[in-house]
Regions:
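N-terminal metal-binding scaffold of metallo-dependent hydrolase/deaminase domains
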Residues: 1-39, 48, 452, 462, ...
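Divalent metal-coordination and catalytic microenvironments
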Residues: 8, 23, 28, 49, ...
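Active-site mouth loops of central-metabolism enzymes
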Residues: 59-70, 155-168, 194-196, 232-237
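Divalent-metal coordination cores built from histidine and acidic residues
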Residues: 69-184, 213-214, 288
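Active-site neighborhoods of metal-dependent hydrolases
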Residues: 133, 138-157, 161-164, 173-191, ...
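C-terminal cap of metal-dependent C-N hydrolases
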Residues: 317-326, 404-411, 416-417, 422, ...
Length: 532
């Protein structure tokens, strides 16, 4: 079927100035782009006064875990309403792929963030995963192979250096994924078991990416001035030390290093922004290709254990409860909180588990007062109640000023880093993260509109080498987002709904039209994207 979209303001994904023109869709491809195309189509849409761009791409996603749900649409719907057609998933070291199905540690996969509950199965290789999801999900998906998943497959959550045999097995798993079309690899240095990897292990993962000329995305070991990642609470910022590790593994190499979610946890960390950007610039001078991404929120979502030191997480429950270990932890947490400008008042419970709904939406400090215990004891109670798998919303991670500065940085890409939860408080980024970037541009706090559109389309497609996506080009897949700039400018953010997005085409199929979803079509519109 041929569809003609006429008289729209066209943003082509390159960062060039927009122009009034038409786009002809033939089947799942863009057939023509230009002014005043002939009305030789089965369906014609007059988009006068509207804007049209390539379908948005979420550059940092975890929706590989939701593409295999038995009913995936509810997990993709809010993103579709933001105009997002494609996801780069498998981030933070925690991917659905990259393990051996007969691994004795298969129950460890998911890193405490995700599970295989209500899914169609487990798929250890990329080939198996793509065979299961291609044309069987709402949106397009490319996948990174996660280091945490591969490490867990060979050694579980063991807090130790891998044996030579284990390391060889882990690297073989990741290399196989790259050969089968993974978009790259990901490290999650703040999550088990990735946090147990030393610099040499990280370097070997990076070398694989160099070998296949694919990106390495990294959730760094620390994202704050002080943390539980390093023993010294004074001196160099932990956030900067964590980046020093990345310098060690990539300096003087052509690695495509992508720093995930540039955030600064705690008010004392905000001043590290300038030096972090300087370090990135210095690393680029050695030949390393460094980029980073952001979401348009000042808070973030994480596992409840994210503030616990590795030595404590590696203990048994009985060891964790020993008085000496509790005292040691308490002293460390108190000192960290004072130095960081971040405390239990800033940690809000999103989900603990059945029977604990009364805690959702409350800070740990508030819960401690209600339960008549110390903040730390309340926090550890919540950790144990959730089997150390609870979910929290934390902030501040950033400021509007920092976000605005990053929006003007040529190396910055956009993403949501959000997913739909079955229970508890949702991450606000699932609703309107991308409309807020567009709104920033229209209100003058963000980059220009052409560059803003590029950061969520062509630039991401380029970074992850997504074939025939991200641009308004003849022969490319017809992923197209239609938006209303007046509605975006006047939109009210943070209301648990999107705004300003009019239509979304995925592979030539109109899946969102004036707020109405084409639910039947969305069962099969999504494609698996292999990167060669």
């Amino acid at each position: 079927m041929k569809q003609l979209l006429k008289n729209a303001k066209l943003y082509d994904g390159t960062g060039a100035e927009p122009f009034i023109g038409d786009v002809l869709i033939d089947g799942d491809r863009i057939a023509k782009v230009g002014p005043a195309l002939a009305d030789e189509a089965d369906v014609v849409y007059d988009l006068s006064g509207k804007s049209l761009s390539p379908g948005f791409i979420d550059g940092h996603s975890h929706n590989d875990w939701f593409a295999i749900k038995k009913e995936p649409l509810p997990y993709f719907e809010p993103f579709i309403r933001q105009g997002i057609a494609t996801f780069v998933a498998g981030n933070c070291g925690v991917s659905t792929i990259g393990f051996e199905p007969d691994s004795p540690h298969a129950d460890k996969l998911g890193g405490g963030l995700f599970t295989y509950q209500d899914t169609t199965g487990r798929y250890g290789t990329l080939d198996e995963f793509f065979a299961a999801v291609d044309r069987n999900m709402p949106c397009n998906l490319s996948v990174l192979a996660g280091h945490c998943s591969a490490r867990a497959a060979v050694s579980g959550f063991a807090n130790r250096k891998l044996t030579p045999e284990e390391e060889t097995g882990m690297l073989a798993i990741m290399e196989k994924a790259l050969q089968q079309g993974a978009a790259g690899l990901s490290l999650g240095m703040m999550y088990e078991p990735g946090l147990y990897a030393d610099v040499e292990e990280q370097r070997k993962v990076a070398e694989l990416c160099v070998k296949y000329n694919k990106p390495l995305t990294v959730h760094p070991r620390a994202e704050s001035k002080v943390s539980m990642a390093y023993p010294q609470l004074f001196g160099r910022s932990h956030l900067l030390r964590a980046f020093d590790e990345l310098v060690e593994i990539s300096k003087n190499t052509p690695l495509k290093l992508h720093y995930s979610h540039a955030i600064f946890v705690g008010r004392s960390s905000f001043k590290d922004k300038a030096e972090l950007l300087c370090l990135m610039d210095e690393l680029r001078k050695t030949g390393t290709d460094v980029t980073f991404d952001i979401y348009n929120e000042c808070l973030g979502v994480s596992v409840i254990t994210v503030i616990l030191p590795g030595w404590y997480q590696g203990m048994s429950v009985e060891e964790k409860r020993k008085p000496f270990n509790r005292l040691k932890l308490a002293a460390l947490v108190k000192a960290t909180s004072l130095l960081l400008g971040f405390g239990f008042k800033d940690i809000v419970v999103a989900y603990i588990g059945p029977g604990y709904e009364r805690f959702e939406g409350k800070s740990v400090h508030q819960i401690a007062k209600e339960e008549g215990m110390s903040d730390l004891n309340a926090y550890l109670m919540l950790c144990e109640a959730s089997d150390f798998k609870g979910r929290v919303n934390m902030g501040p991670y950033s400021t509007k000023e920092i976000i605005s500065d990053f929006e003007h940085d040529e190396h910055c890409l956009y993403m949501t880093d959000a997913w739909v939860e079955d229970h508890g408080v949702q991450n606000p980024a699932i609703y309107d993260c991308y409309p807020k970037f567009l709104r920033d541009s229209l209100l003058g706090t963000g980059d220009t509109m052409p560059n803003t559109v590029r950061r969520m389309t062509g630039a991401i497609a380029d970074r992850f080498m997504l074939p025939e996506r991200g641009y308004l080009k003849e022969g490319y897949f017809a992923d197209l987002t239609v938006f209303d700039e007046n509605m975006l400018r006047a939109g009210v953010p943070d209301r648990e709904e999107s705004f300003g997005i009019e239509k979304l085409f995925i592979n030539g199929t109109l899946v969102l039209d004036g707020g109405k979803l084409n639910e039947q079509a969305l069962k099969t519109t999504g494609r698996a994207i292999r990167v060669k």
